[in-house]
Amino acid sequence: MKALAFPILLLVLVACTEANVGKPQSVGEPYDVTLVATDKRLLKTVSGMMGVTMAGLPQEERLFTVKTAKGKEVNAATMYERTIVVVRRQDGNTRIRYERNPYARDQLLVFIDTPSAEALRADSAKTAKALQRLIDQFETRVAMNHDRQNHNLKLMRTVEKTIGCNITIPSDIRASKTGKDFVWISDNGTRTMRNICVYAVNGIRTSQEEIVSLRDSVMAANIKGEREGMVMRTERRADVMFSRHGKAIVARGLWHMEGDAMGGPFVSVTLPDSARNRTLTAEAFVYAPSTTKARTMKRLEAVLYSLDIE
């Protein structure tokens, strides 16, 4: 069957948000997805859409955890799940509709309507991209809302005083170290160590090479190992990936400590501050050698999107 020629924006992404008063909290972890359909072929196709691996990690890791339930609609067994995707046969083009918080708080309900299993397979690339982006935006929004309600005001004021910008710091990240136009915040975790750095440099430096070079110089000056010469560097043997998020430039890649075995993933958000002729960057990096990192990085990435120029 010929693929339908529609751009992602024409997937009919219709949102409906219900009031949260009196509703229970949804069940499940971020990026948990429950698929509901009567047709096994539809379940298999959409499940395949969720099988992507997350970019910018040392090893391949899937971001989404998927379970399936057979049925036409949401029922008592599935209605409180965090993200529910109902796949239905309907006449017309393949399209997506979604609702926020229909049965519970912090919940996303997605309907994928398609005329047939063959049509859904033909449209799978564009449908998958739209579905993944929709769930990712939902999880980012939930995380940012949580941080606004559970933040570390003391460290937020430290960043504001040192850098002259605003960023929402989660309440469970408490340790900090300051330098010149630089703040390093960490939870000092033993199994997984989560870190956020915020820094500013003079001049507007937003090209890809400038962002990487700037990162190396700032991190080498402020994050050092136990012995002389141990400094943090960007891993140049792996690609650094760049994307846009509004006015911000997002970079993803790997870091390592020169002269040591430490390393892991990082993600950064860079903003030009034209009024002060400077460049602001907020970065998250993780050291977790024996555990998965995808969801931890996504959770920290949501923190970075709260970066705001005063």
Regions found by a protein language model. Name each.
Residues 69-118, 223-277, 291-292, 305:
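Signature of long, low-cysteine stretches enriched in small and polar/charged residues
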